[in-house]
């Protein structure tokens, strides 16, 4: 986005929020293909104006129409030559060229709003806040004072037209929205790009950026209701929410203004809660409160109705679970989160009498879910379904140092991510599985038994390699067990973790 500061020159049409003319700018396609103006894929005459080049897009569209025409009317080829496959590839290429430039154009209004919002304000850049572990200190500080929460699976739109309807509140240019509809309906195999497969989206790598943009915009619109209710019910309004609530018109029909004003007080009274906390990662969010389950149940059915009325998404109530933190655990970001009572006894001795005072304090607890880890290791062929280590014959062709380095890297990644748990017994079992699987892989390579191979190699080599740690920045808290000088007995949150490492991805 930094290139926009250099290349973006808005004329009068863009000042009126018309972004369609930007499609005819050459630098848009240069930015889309991560190239400078000198390395552009387009070639113009030396005397031609590069600022507004209609010939660029016209050339692409001409090629596109020509190829589509030839694909439908070439009927006189022999059986040895199939032109449709070749022409279809070229058609997809021209579609892709125009589409990638259009992706950059659609992102410009949001980038300009961000620049105007940050203008004159000091912006603190901290890459540590991008770490997945940065959310756990917040949960550790807040969840011990809360009673119940909503475990929410955010539904995704069943049709991309819903995203276009939502996007029109931000993009005021009808021509750009019509062009977006054209790509969504005419792009080859477009429907397969967002088809759910095994609880995840099957994204094309080249279109991944735009699909993530649409999906994140959908999540942003979903979260705007929390910001709106919070700002209306609290005097401490969130400054960062100004960007999200800037709309053309929040309510279109004037007839609804009186009804909305009349019912707003009742709605805010129902959902007013000074101890409401919200966090989200991808399509899963948590809404926690200090109040009873009655308020959580109201929030549950309110969200279901909100999705159906605003996003036209039918969502089952079972996608939202009401969870009591003191009774159940929550599976979130690879941890089992819970709040348990920690009893403590204080004996008071007076002159003649003594008494024992029993007290219980809430403590935020994080555990490592061992069953999903076993399932992931079994999927990656490091162990069977029962957790018994097996060899990795696919890696047997590599060198000994490469095999040991692969197994050690997987364990260090898992240990690094799950360092926030005080109970490390699960990590010890994972370490045992990977060490023995590594030993069996090496023994299989050298056609020997595990016992004789370890006797010749020495167990200390594997032990030293698996316990090797990198120097990274981490957070520890006084509330953790700090009586022992050993670091592994503390709860540690690292600030360099940007994704969840799955052993199945280390193929």
UniProtKB/Swiss-Prot annotation:
Listed under GO biological process in this entry are: mRNA processing; RNA splicing; tRNA processing
Q: Where is the protein found, in the record's own terms?
A: Plastid, Chloroplast
Q: What is its main location?
A: plastid
Q: Which Pfam families does the annotation name?
A: Intron_maturas2 (PF01348), MatK_N (PF01824)
Q: Which Gene Ontology molecular-function terms are recorded?
A: RNA binding
Please list which residues make up the signal peptide. none
Question: Which GO CC terms are listed, alphabetically?
Answer: chloroplast
Q: Which InterPro entries match?
A: Domain_X, Maturase_MatK, Maturase_MatK_N
Which keywords does this chain's UniProt record carry?
Answer: Chloroplast, mRNA processing, Plastid, RNA-binding, tRNA processing
Q: Where are the bilayer-spanning segments?
A: none
What protein family is recorded? Belongs to the intron maturase 2 family. MatK subfamily.
Function per UniProt: Usually encoded in the trnK tRNA gene intron. Probably assists in splicing its own and other chloroplast group II introns.
Tell me what this protein is called. Answer: Maturase K
* Source organism of this protein record: Lyonia ligustrina (Maleberry)
Query: Gene symbol?
Result: matK
